[in-house]
Amino acid sequence: MSLFLAPIHQIMYDKIHYTDDLATALAKKDPSTARALEENFPAIEKEPLEAVIDEGNIHGWLAERVVLAEKRLAFAACALAKKDRAGLMDAVKDFGRKEAFSGSADEAFILYDRRFLNGMPCDRVHMPEEAKEGVAWRITRDVHGEYYDEAGLYDALIAAWWEGLLDGSELNYHRDGNLCTLNCQVKCNSTEW
């Protein structure tokens, strides 16, 4: 439990906003979903963290916003999946593509880790794994499934985001069970094309 604001709290606040921005972008694809999202879930504060956080309960305040952002994203995604699953995945790909990423597997993972909520940092949801090439991590527990009506929908959203993010790069995201990898589609260091 923290007694004062630290950089990790700003990182969490930024992740909360990114998740909420994705929820809002998805909801805008369907006016009734956008309306229902705002009616059923309060908006997340946009003011600077130090202006809105309860400094007497930093961890609790952030945890409440994590849950709210997760619920907002799940609501928007589940509503759109029922109406137009392909359109939902295209919208998530576009959201990832807007990052205009170019870089290494390490840089891609750092970007992903700085964007998405995967519990609180102390939860250690992503654990690094040995990789011959690129980056690998194991998902130690599902912190998103409880918010979704459809099993696996969050994982599909993340896969679509990775597809958009890595569009045009030599990197490839792959998930096999709880093991995720980022590596080259072709020999990244090769001069033979």
Placement of each model-derived feature along the sequence:
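N-terminal accessory segment detector
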Residues: 1-132, 193
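Short, hydrophobic/π-rich interface segment
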Residues: 131-178
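Short, charged/polar, Gly/Pro-enriched secondary-structure boundary elements
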Residues: 144-147, 188-193
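Beta-rich nucleic-acid/ligand-interaction surfaces
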Residues: 175-189
